[in-house]
């Protein structure tokens, strides 16, 4: 098995798994760290954790458990996947997790490559952009859990980790894989653990994929997976085979949206104009969760024959979110919404729903 991916949340794991498959690498996605070996025949395994916003100690422990399981399956290269908006404050866990993974693997250096140009995430001179805006000037500055106040990836990772950061800027990336590999080899300061990579286009990600094929540990958003998978598929003549390894299930579908990001708010606003949609009543979640889940289940089930999948959404704008958090508390409101969605998904599965679209 070639690649083992440790993803810090479920939606991100799904993103990177789909990019790997689309670019030619047969992939299996797992929810959580398995407790036993599995008879896998894929070339990549993605383990979905729930560590994006948890304390560093917990994130490190779970990430190391995932790494050790992937090592036991014979993976040759490892990929720590976080969000393309680098959701993490100075107290965040990206740096501590990278430090722990490097130590476990006996490595001294990795890369930071969150760029995903197809979604408007680019890196230039080490600064992360969302569309035309710097990260800290975008909607991410209002993120309810990880408000982003700086767009400079080197500074962000140095505040969290135990090492220094270096940069391979776009003019070098534009010269191709050999130039990137040479620049990596030329980083001779032993204090540098993290090398930030610029990327403005998919071609830059393809360049990175070739240049990093021998690096034991890489890190980034989903974008770098495009380059790694495409390079692997071209070298093994496997492009196109991965898409035939499994097909989506048929059957009733439902959309469950819990993210309160600016992008998800826009997507929910557009979708609810076209499909049956119902907002989550947080007070009902606290008053009688079991009864409220039954109410939502019955509503979704009644819409199963609609042309577009019905949607249940807790997505809301920052002002409303602040009022909710003030009333119920940040942690309590977040956990109760998660409990509601978990119970709702289980109830809908029992009703015969087979496709769950998790927005955000």
Question: What residue ranges belong to the model's regions?
Answer:
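Conserved, well-structured core segments that form the ligand-binding/active-site neighborhood
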Residues: 131-298
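C-terminal structural cap/anchor segments
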Residues: 300-359
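Cap/lid and interdomain-hinge subdomains that line or gate substrate/regulatory clefts
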Residues: 1-2, 43, 59, 67-78, ...
